[in-house]
Amino acid sequence: MVSVQINDNESIDKMLKRFKKKYERAGVLKEFRKKAYFVKPSVDGRLKRSRSRRRAQRANEERNS
């Protein structure tokens, strides 16, 4: 769990900004979305391969440009 202590003379906005940064770096939201519903292993593998292919294609296009 992500927690942030408010420092002396620190505004709420700064504290919230620090919390948001820690929250994003911890990957809490990403993990929550990933576990929101069940994905069959076969479908998960298919999606991973598809993402990998797309990433490789983009990298190849950048190298050729």
Swiss-Prot record:
GO terms under biological process:
translation
Its signal peptide is: none
InterPro entries cross-referenced by the UniProt entry? Ribosomal_bS21, Ribosomal_bS21_sf
Taken from the UniProt entry, a GO cellular component term is: ribosome
What domain of life is recorded for the organism? Bacteria
Query: What GO molecular functions are on record for this protein?
Result: structural constituent of ribosome
Q: Gene3D superfamilies, alphabetically?
A: Ribosomal protein S8
Instruction: Provide the residue span(s) of the region labelled Disordered.
Output: 45-65
| This protein's UniProt keywords | Ribonucleoprotein, Ribosomal protein
UniProt lists compositionally biased (Basic residues) regions at: 48-57
Q: Does the keyword Ribonucleoprotein apply?
A: yes
- Per its UniProt record, what HAMAP family does this chain match? Ribosomal_bS21 (MF_00358)
Stated family:
Belongs to the bacterial ribosomal protein bS21 family.
**Full protein name:** Small ribosomal subunit protein bS21
What taxonomic lineage is listed for the species of origin?
Bacteria, Pseudomonadati, Chlorobiota, Chlorobiia, Chlorobiales
